[in-house]
Amino acid sequence: MKTFEGKVVVITGAGSGLGRAYAREFANRGAVLALNDYDSSSLRDTCALMPPRTKTFSSAFDVSDRDAMYRFADDVAAAVGPAHVVINNAGIAGVGAPAWALADKDFERLMAVDFFSVVHGTRAFLPHLRENADGAIVNISSLFGLTGAPNKSDYCAAKFAVRGFTEALMVEMTREPVSVHLVHPGGTATNISNNTGDTGFSDHFLRTDPADVAVGTAEAILKGRPRLVVAHAAFKTQVASSFLPRRLMNRILWHQLAPVIDTSQYPGTAARRAPRSTWPFH
């Protein structure tokens, strides 16, 4: 793909944060937008922020609803034409508690939104991308699709699943004219990230402007880069998780994160808590 001018770009979770930043970035590059969000009011706000010349189609629904996603793909094709780029961005952050304290329904809900919506979005739009013979699938993982973290077992599970699904898809699509991209944002300041019980974590780590991630993603598509690790702490974490012994990495993660998360449900936490390290996340 050489340009986004006139291309149909589908973005889920476009009502705020990174999804809204994607909408702005691709609108500024001349794309036709097909936007989704669960919150119809936020979705309307995003549409209103687009340049007047931008052709926009929008649909509010829950991305974990498989049938709704397939209807969306057909509705997009009917309204603005078959998709050229699909960005499976929608997600929720979870409740911010250790694995043993999570309710089954909360774990299942997060997996439905953060992982299975990516599967549904990819499979629903793939026939349309093939029809154009010039397309891109962009699946959003996370810093926590590179390493585990306390109070993030549900979120990490979903984002690692996105990573595995997308890496397999890259191999499967090798001989096709549709490129596949995996994005690992880290420390991105969005409403989704802020809506957890760990406000200290949000205040301390969520420093990156979503617009920077959106620019990096657009350039990755144009340059054919399959993986993008971008934003605060993501690259350092990728390197550390690849080369450090797991036990050392676990200690670093705990020392770094324990002071800024809710540790009230950890037995003996106060006695075990160590001074916070400033690496690899700074």
What are these regions (language model features)?
Residues V8, G15-S16:
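Conserved glycine-rich cofactor-binding loop
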Residues S142:
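Residue(s) in the substrate-gating loop at a strand-loop-helix junction
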Residues L182, S202-T237:
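C-terminal helical subdomain
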